[in-house]
Amino acid sequence: MLILVSPAKTLDFDNPPGSENYSMPTLLDQSEQLIEVCRKLTPTDVATLMKVSDKIAGLNVARFSSWQKEFTPTNAKQAVFAFRGDVYTGLDADTLSPQSLDRAQQQLRILSGLYGLLKPLDLMQPYRLEMGTRLANERGTNLYQFWGDIITDELNQTTAEQGSEFIINLASNEYFKAVKPKKLNAGLITPVFKDCKNGQYKVISFFAKKARGMMVRYILDNNVDSLEALTKFDTAGYYYSEKDSTVNEPVFLREEQ
């Protein structure tokens, strides 16, 4: 099975990575085209487009300016160790065993507004370009139009090469909209995580994001290779609810914390 997750806004390029191994993104030619578009933006443009402070806008204008296509361990970092945020807190990549990290490199893919699709050990340079950004480009008015079928084609190629029957979608709606589900050759499974609050089970964003990362960790550490094995996920008190689930949306519940 192939696993999809979102990236994170928070980045860590200060601490050393958890592995010396690295790979290269496959869609850097596309990334370079986006960088050329972004380099035409002023700090004011970026602040408005991304709805960020002047300070963050200035930082990202500088990032666009210094971005270069030749990635090395000196000017870039492996994606799974660079991203920080709720999903990555749940995954805790720094403590993955070498075996689990190898499985991650095969099975895990990170959607990205700038890089399209990243393997965990793909080097990346720091950036901020969320998939929902309405960045006008030669292919349209936003990044969904820019990426078109490219990400979906990459996923189909990967699942074909690996013989993967299912894609486990643990990405946010914003990022998964860059994928064309009807054009996927593998089956699509989208787990749902609900926490009990005031007697009702509901999706609580912070908990759900962390749970997505914990499920990735569970799959990697336990070498999960079937949907039945996936329903055994029980990290941090979550449990599979058969009565609330459908074939394509397994639901995991947790009692009030």
Curated annotation (Swiss-Prot):
GO terms for cellular component: cytosol. InterPro entries: YaaA. It comes from the Bacteria. Disulfide bonds: none annotated. Coiled coil: none annotated. GO terms for biological process: response to hydroperoxide. Pfam families: H2O2_YaaD (PF03883). HAMAP family: UPF0246. Belongs to the UPF0246 family. This is UPF0246 protein Spea_1078. The lineage of its organism: Bacteria, Pseudomonadati, Pseudomonadota, Gammaproteobacteria, Alteromonadales.
